[in-house]
Swiss-Prot record:
This enzyme is involved in nucleotide metabolism: it produces dUMP, the immediate precursor of thymidine nucleotides and it decreases the intracellular concentration of dUTP so that uracil cannot be incorporated into DNA. Pathway: Pyrimidine metabolism; dUMP biosynthesis; dUMP from dCTP (dUTP route): step 2/2. HAMAP family: dUTPase_bact (MF_00116). InterPro entries: dUTPase, dUTPase-like, dUTPase-like_sf, dUTPase_trimeric. Its EC number is 3.6.1.23. Keywords: Hydrolase, Magnesium, Metal-binding, Nucleotide metabolism. CDD domains: trimeric_dUTPase. One of its GO terms (biological process) is dUMP biosynthetic process. This is Deoxyuridine 5'-triphosphate nucleotidohydrolase. Pfam families: dUTPase (PF00692).
Length: 151
């Protein structure tokens, strides 16, 4: 397990609400909560920025974190991430915020403390461009969207 430095920005974390944790031993993501002052209503088509009450510092340039949606929020309520995926670089130290977009047809009330997203650590490989005149030919070649078929 990798150590992740965190600062609690909202004093309710650790008292009223637990620190982010893995739901099961096999979980890939740490659940992040909506650390709001009061419940908010997100109207259809509306996007709001919600604080998690934490800041993190990964520190290791071989790692980054992704903020991903929780599947139940999108499937049951139409609440997805406004930017689809949040990328947290290893040298970022600011507050974690979650952009929530209501893509549904009805208003959604986001309760204080609701688990709204998950934080997943991922390996990072930085690359440099090697400029070439031609690529080595492959079976796929330049075939784009849908080129590999559906079956």
């Amino acid at each position: 397990m990798h150590a992740l430095q965190a600062k609690i920005l909202d004093p309710r974390i650790g008292t009223e609400f637990p620190l982010p944790q893995y739901a099961t031993p096999g979980s890939a993501g740490l659940d992040l909560r909506a650390m709001l002052q009061e419940d908010i209503v997100i109207k259809p088509g509306e996007t709001v920025l919600i604080p998690t009450g934490l800041s993190v510092y990964i520190g290791d340039p071989n790692l980054a974190a992704l903020i991903l949606p929780r599947s139940g929020m999108g499937h049951k309520h139409g609440i997805v991430l406004g930017n689809l995926v949040g990328l947290i670089d290893s040298d970022y130290q600011g507050p974690l915020m979650v952009s929530c977009w209501n893509r549904g047809q009805t208003e959604f009330t986001m309760p204080v403390g609701e688990r709204l997203a998950q934080l997943v650590l991922v390996p990072v490989v930085q690359a440099h461009f090697e400029m070439v005149e031609e690529f080595v030919e492959t079976e796929r070649g330049t075939g784009g969207f849908g080129h590999s078929g559906t079956k």
